[in-house]
Amino acid sequence: MGETVRFGISIDDKLLESFDRLIEQKGYMNRSEAVRDLIRAALVELKWEGGEEETVGTVTLVYNHHVRDLSDKLTEQQHSHHNEIVSALHVHLDAHNCLEVLVVRGKAREVKKIADELIGVKGVKHGKLVMTTTGEELH
């Protein structure tokens, strides 16, 4: 980690009040920690835009397992990306619905593509991709 540098920020008082409430809700010790997290998040998002950054994400799917061939289609998709899908969790939510959480690792562009393919399978009720960094480039 590099040397810590202090700098000032000019900010509207209403925005600062809102920021302070956010800091309290999130449990930050001080404004500096919150600002550092915001900067890191913005830098990670920026790197993903190029699509070449190594990333990891979770793809969450909710679907009715009684829908004809849906489970097989999802399994086929997962097997076609076995190098990128590093883990899968399957949960029976009730007598009809299942939840799958997949951990996917690879270039941002590829992770998004895999998520879109899985979420787009006909019969998936809800799907969401949450991407995060591998942490290698963060300080």
Curated annotation (Swiss-Prot):
One of its GO terms (biological process) is response to nickel cation. Keywords: DNA-binding, Metal-binding, Nickel, Transcription, Transcription regulation. Its cofactor is Ni(2+). Ni(2+) binds at H79, H90, H92, C98. GO terms for molecular function: DNA binding; DNA-binding transcription factor activity; nickel cation binding. Pfam families: NikR_C, RHH_1. SUPFAM superfamilies: ACT-like (SSF55021), Ribbon-helix-helix (SSF47598). InterPro entries: Acetolactate_synth/TF_NikR_C, ACT-like_dom_sf, Arc_rbn_hlx_hlx, CopG, CopG/NikR_regulator, Ni_resp_reg_NikR, Ribbon_hlx_hlx, TF_NikR_Ni-bd_C. It comes from the Bacteria. Binds 1 nickel ion per subunit. Belongs to the transcriptional regulatory CopG/NikR family. Transcriptional regulator. This is Putative nickel-responsive regulator.
